[in-house]
Curated annotation (Swiss-Prot):
Species this protein is from: Mesorhizobium japonicum (strain LMG 29417 / CECT 9101 / MAFF 303099)
Domain of life: Bacteria
GO molecular function, one term: dGTPase activity
Organism ancestry: Bacteria, Pseudomonadati, Pseudomonadota, Alphaproteobacteria, Hyphomicrobiales
Pfam families: HD, HD_assoc
Domain (HD): residue spans on this chain: 75-219
InterPro entries hit by this protein: dGTPase, dGTPase-like, dNTPase_2, HD/PDEase_dom, HD_domain, PHydrolase_assoc_dom
Name assigned to this protein: Deoxyguanosinetriphosphate triphosphohydrolase-like protein 1
PROSITE patterns: HD (PS51831)
An example Gene Ontology biological process: dGTP catabolic process
Amino acid sequence: MTNELGDIGFGYRPRAAYATDPALSRGRLFDEVESPTRTPFQRDRDRIIHSTAFRRLKHKTQVFIAHEGDHYRTRLTHSIEVAQIARAVARALRGDEDLAEAVALVHDFGHTPFGHTGEDALNDKMAAWGGFDHNAQSLRIVTRLEARYAEFDGLNLTWETLEGLVKHNGPLTDASGKGLKGPVPQAIRDYSQMQDLELDRFAGIEAQCAAIADDIAYNTHDIDDGLRAGLLTLDMLKTVSLPGKILEGVRQRYPRLDDVRTGHELMRRQITAMVEDVIVSATANLERVGPRSADAVRAAGETMVTFSAEMAAAEKELKAFLYKHLYRHEEVMRVRAGAEQIVRDLFDVYFADPRAMPDGWREGLDRAEDRIKARSVADFLAGMTDTYALKEHRRLFDRTPDLS
């Protein structure tokens, strides 16, 4: 496959006609003087990196609860890895690397403590008030909750970064406004009333690069963490077509290599294989459709940045393997049950008595209607790190589940 790529990924070629041009950005909700030294998308990336929400990702879980070890991935390390892959794919496709990086870095801002376990628990608790969705929460953080600037709430990111954050996995509605996968979260609908995010159209090419980079990163690095935890073995991976084929090649080339380095070599080669497959497949898609502008990508009616059919099938098989042997492993499930209980307990306490929350969060909630109170509690809870949630539970309860 590398021969098909030539120097495609080296960044020597000019920006494509279908790329998102920062000079033509649709701007920000609140007008600002543009920087003389950075493009709008570079400013977005920098604002994301300097935000409090970005730093909190350091202590938020991917698969393994952060308490379990210092070398497992967190939302922060995952986001950095996604950003690196997104830049590589965007560079090869001649898109705007900075926009792809910005979307990648911000895409996990709305995740709760304890990964998807925490999100499921909070979504259940919020069922009567519209539920909880981490993409909608990411939007709330960067448009309302992050308090850094004198003239506006949030980060005042460009339209293109917000569009990518909300729609990196595809359109949310049909042309009539009906949700494609159920009701669209109210936070997204409300913001789109102020700055139309065109929820019925696809995102630009750069957001699509970030989305597939997310898939590549977690499909590969969850294997790495699973091997480190002893829940997966190299012999188990032999039964899965993509890592199995790569592992065979590594062992043939390095027959005396120890298992740790063999695992790292497997991860490195798997990322390379998936990235190169995406570049070739996306290039073919773009040549077939022939978009001549960023808006033409949005109106194309399909995702352009995709795996080949063969790689998509291999990725589906790998996801099924990880779900069965890692995400549903009895040890992971035991810890998740405790984490779920922590989130549920905290929500119940804060909702029943907002005075249990810090001053900045509880103000005015004693007289607020339940809908507003519940959303404020969800905002506070979703912003917690794993470590802070554990600390709060120990402060408020006599007994806290053991997550070790």
